[in-house]
Design a protein with these regions (language model features):
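Lectin-like carbohydrate-binding module/patch detector with strong preference for beta-trefoil
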Residues: 2-152
């Protein structure tokens, strides 16, 4: 006896639906998703000209806290990304934002495993992105970020 096919209620009008919401990221980061980067009950955010932080939101969907990563590798395991806002402003080495993609810094986003979180390193300097409990953002720390993928 064969069980019923679980998706038989799908039709062309609802076959491409996605569920709105968020989910904590696990494993390797992939490009093309809206992401939030959070630590210490704060989230990386942007004000149009620089990277900053603000209080984490319950649904992880505040527009100024959403980012998209763009893979810059050659081989599948290359961990090289540009980080941009959803308005295509790129994070630079000075943690400012630029419309010029060529000024974007390259970052490595490494899953530390076992739910610890992700380390985010700027590749030229080797310094890790830091989000302090006071909300300040800098390079040169040891913050582990929880990353959430968000569907609006």
């Amino acid at each position: 006896v064969q069980p019923d096919i679980p998706y038989k209620k799908l039709n062309p009008s609802n076959s491409m639906e996605v569920n709105k919401g968020f989910k904590r990221l696990r494993g390797d980061v992939t490009e093309g998703r809206r992401l939030t980067f959070e630590a210490h009950n704060r989230a990386l955010s942007h004000n149009g000209s620089k990277l900053k932080s603000s209080s984490s939101s319950k649904e992880h969907d505040e527009k100024d806290q959403l980012f998209v990563v763009h893979w810059q590798g050659v081989n599948p395991k290359d961990n090289r990304f540009r980080i941009a806002t959803t308005d295509q402003l790129y994070v630079t080495k000075s943690l400012s934002l630029s419309k010029n993609e060529e000024k974007a810094a390259l970052f490595s986003l490494k899953d530390m495993g076992n739910g610890v979180g992700y380390s985010i390193s700027e590749l030229d300097s080797g310094k890790r992105l830091q989000l302090n409990e006071d909300g300040s953002v800098a390079l040169g720390g040891d913050t582990y970020f929880q990353i959430y993928r968000v569907t609006l």
